[in-house]
Design a protein with these regions (language model features):
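Terminal substrate-recognition subdomain of acyl/acetyltransferases
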Residues: 1-110, 114-140, 144-204
């Protein structure tokens, strides 16, 4: 039997459709919820991924509910590994949206991310999504550093190659009211509350 679990929120993705005579309110852009599912038996060998310790419990609960055989390892490194960081950009001008896909993480990661974030914001982007691979341990204080740059955890997503990536969002100074989001499943509401708490850490 298929089992579904809310795995990611994608916030402020594109503008609502305009209707004559109808006035919008806060959250003038659409946000999306994504779900993962195990459509068959769960006999595949367990796949392990690295996750920040702070998100291990919520990620484990997502995989457990979806009955997907993934183990979340919360090992952390004292600091970022040597080497240069590579982040690929996929800018969608019509949405004022950008995907920042991390290809490699080196000691200059946060400097590179800060520069790219400032550049896209100055060129009209108002929402940035950061896609981070889970094939290596994260450095201690990873999320705290991302929070300082305005990025906050929004979930996890499967990639085409069968791997998993963490998703972080930066609303680039947009006001956002999580109370306006309406969900009809307990796990989606729980994920929304979790993401809201992460968002609020960027405001401190």
């Amino acid at each position: 039997m298929a089992s579904f679990a809310a795995n990611m929120l994608q916030l402020s993705v594109y503008h609502h459709a305009d209707f004559v005579g109808i006035k919008g309110d806060t959250n003038e852009r659409e946000s999306l919820a994504y779900f993962i599912s195990n459509m068959g038996s769960n006999k595949k060998e367990c796949k392990n991924i690295y996750v920040p310790a702070r998100h291990r419990d919520v990620l484990c609960s997502i995989f457990d509910k979806a009955k997907i055989n993934v183990g979340c390892i919360a090992d952390e490194m004292a600091e970022l590994t040597e080497g240069k960081s590579v982040i690929e950009l996929n800018i969608m001008p019509e949405r004022q949206y950008v995907d920042l896909e991390v290809k490699s993480i080196g000691t200059d990661f946060f400097q590179v991310l800060r520069k790219l974030t400032n550049n896209v914001r100055q060129n009209g982007v108002i929402t940035a999504e950061l896609i981070v691979p889970t094939d290596m341990p994260f450095a201690t204080g990873w999320d705290e550093e991302l929070n300082r740059l305005g990025f906050f955890f929004c979930g996890i997503k499967p990639l085409k190659d069968g791997s998993w990536a963490l998703a972080y969002t930066n609303l680039l100074y947009q006001s956002f009211d999580f109370g306006k989001m309406q969900f009809f499943s307990d796990d989606t509401r729980a994920l929304c509350q979790y993401v809201k708490g992460e968002y609020e850490k960027t405001l401190l």
